[in-house]
Amino acid sequence: YKNDRRALPGLCLNSDPCAITCTANDFGFEKIFARQLEAFAKRGDTLALFSSSGNSPNLLEAISAAKKLGVSTAMFCGNGGGKCAGLADVEIIVPSNNGARVQEAHELLLHTVIEEIEANL
């Protein structure tokens, strides 16, 4: 909204409760993001993942699916990265185990990343 520029494509994988419920019921909750990636992602895309713990099975599955599809991954997490540590192409690990503080840091970091992307268009 600050800059008058062309729109950029993006998709939030947790915004469709129908897709999440259907996938969770038929394939398991751990597949809710991986299945959507299989449908929509293509080589050259980037997947941004957010977790305060880094231990979410659905994010581990999403990283695996992204790798198979040639999709770059950027992981924002706390808790030393948890089980996701070392799996993403880019990791931004907030040095805290306090979920609220990690989420607050994620919001600031996301805005900073978006500003950098816009500055480099």
Language-model segments: what does each one mean?
Residues Y1-L121:
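Glycine-rich phosphate-binding loops that contact phosphosugars or nucleotide phosphates
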